[in-house]
Amino acid sequence: MKRLILMLIVGAMLFALLSCSGKNNAPDGKTYTDNYVYTMWKTSDTSTYTLYRINVLSATGTPVCPDPLCGHDTNECPFYGINTEGSGIVGSGIYYLRGSVPMQHCRQVCRFDLESGKLAILYENSAATIAKLFVFDDYVYFLELVGDGKESPTYTFRLMRYGIHDGKTADLGNTGAAKNTDIYACVDGRLYWEDHDSASCFSTDTDGRNRVDGDRLSDRTRSGNYSVMIENVQPADREYINMYTCNVVSKDLTTGETQTIIRNNPSFPMVYDGKVFYYRFQEEPLLIGYIVDEESNERKQIFDARGTKLYICDFDGQNDRLLCDIAGSGYLFGITNSMLWSSGNGEYYCTTLISYRQSEDGQTVERGNNAIVVINIKTGSYKIADME
């Protein structure tokens, strides 16, 4: 089983819901709409991930990089070394971090213009690491890790701000933030921060000052009069390839009452366009292969708990229904949180599909090919994307 886990688990799962926005307000007040959703992807003939956009009408995915000859593996590519954490689209611009090492040691804050195909480096500091990015309608904030220059340096996080409207960068100084601190909202002239390790929270003004400890928005993930949260995260049975289950709880923002709307969800749900996307634990689990237990040398069956069905409901648990079933496609649903952004068309959602195969020696189950599926969230119709 240890061997199976090492082969199948890549990266770490965030203990949070992912929320996306279907509209993007340009600095000139216009809305940039191009019927695309965005995700990171690599084709079978390369080892390099790059940013793709998928046309939701044709289900065709192409690299966002405008150079058809680019291998996406050098600094000449605008998305080489991209760190998508905290990135976002405002108007026709994608705002993201970039560095010499992909997903690490970011030195640049960048904007890629989807209309012109041009990259602009908004801020660069070769002597510091940019650790966090937070994109809002008016400002892009980022935390810069800076040493004090001593032989045994002490590092602090300096808050920086780039104005989307005026193009000016401001050094807001040391606000006492740490690497595990996020700015999760900018509302009515206040920044709302949350420290994930200590579960503490506070707010500041948009200059990072006038701190109020304990101040938080009532709920971070909401739609209408309801918000949703995750509770009771539990490890799944060893017979399942899925590693955990959780309950999804709905909260009435007027009364404060909560109710569990989804139980035993074998993945963290996706929150998008006022809906909750989730899987149901399979009553008849899908057999995906066999493993040989390293301790007992016994050959055992291994199952997938997510299966081929994706469900959808409102934040209050109403209008709960099967959205689509991809049985017969040759794939199973993977983790729901794979779509980065939607630029203009909120009727579509994309996520990763996965497959499994028995290893050549018959000792374990391996991951097969992946795919991207584009789903119409109103009709449930779907297409497997052709990723060029």
Predicted regions and their residues:
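C-terminal motif of bacterial Sec signal peptides marking the signal peptidase cleavage site
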Residues: 16-19
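Structural motif
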Residues: 45-53, 98, 102-110, 148-160, ...
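Repeated scaffold domains used in trafficking and secretory/extracellular systems
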Residues: 24-32, 73-89, 127-137, 177-188, ...
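A short beta-strand motif characteristic of beta-propeller blades
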Residues: 62-65, 69-78, 118-124, 168-174, ...
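Residue position within the beta-strands of beta-propeller blades
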Residues: 37-41, 95-97, 141-144, 192-194, ...
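Short loop/turn segments that connect beta-strands within beta-propeller blades
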Residues: 55-59, 113-117, 163-167, 204-208, ...
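Positively charged n-region of N-terminal signal peptides that target proteins for export
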Residues: 1-4
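Blade-level signature of beta-propeller repeat domains, shared across WD40, Kelch, NHL, RCC1
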Residues: 343-388
